Amino acid sequence: MPSQMEHAMETLMFTFHKYAGDKNYLSKEDLRALMEKEFPGFLENQRDPMALDKIMKDLDQCRDGKVGFQSFFSLVAGLTIACNDYFVVHMKQKGRK
């Protein structure tokens, strides 16, 4: 029986390929659709209307308009780290460990 972490890994892979389709990469439009559906709170809370363009520029290392799985995973890892940092700060403020 798969562990929670194995399920999380599977979810990341399936989510990427759901939006990438057969081409094995995300276009800017694919990335926008993924972010709007899978991370709605992130885009809703952005004050910068160019946030998605900046994310795409950061992830598109080859400057070919494509985001591969490794870059997608870097985005998810960065968001997870930021969420963890926020969680840790607020848990400490509440006196929890």
From Swiss-Prot:
Lineage, broadest ranks: Eukaryota, Metazoa, Chordata, Craniata, Vertebrata
Oligomer and partners: Heterotetramer containing 2 light chains of S100A10/p11 and 2 heavy chains of ANXA2/p36.
Region (Ancestral calcium site) residue spans: 60-71
PANTHER family tied to this protein: PROTEIN S100-A10, S100 CALCIUM-BINDING PROTEIN
Signal peptide (UniProt feature, chain positions): none
Function: Because S100A10 induces the dimerization of ANXA2/p36, it may function as a regulator of protein phosphorylation in that the ANXA2 monomer is the preferred target (in vitro) of tyrosine-specific kinase.
UniProt source species: Gallus gallus
Entries under PROSITE patterns matching the protein: EF_HAND_2 (PS50222), S100_CABP (PS00303)
Key word Repeat present: yes
Pfam families: S_100 (PF01023)
Record's keyword terms, sorted: Repeat
Additional facts recorded: Does not appear to bind calcium. Contains 2 ancestral calcium site related to EF-hand domains that have lost their ability to bind calcium.
InterPro entries xref list: EF-hand-dom_pair (IPR011992), EF_hand_dom (IPR002048), S100-A10 (IPR028476), S100/CaBP7/8-like_CS (IPR001751), S100_Ca-bd_sub (IPR013787)
Gene Ontology cellular-component annotations: cytoplasm
Domain EF-hand intervals: 47-82
Gene: S100A10
Protein name stated in the entry: Protein S100-A10
Any one GO MF annotation of this record: calcium ion binding
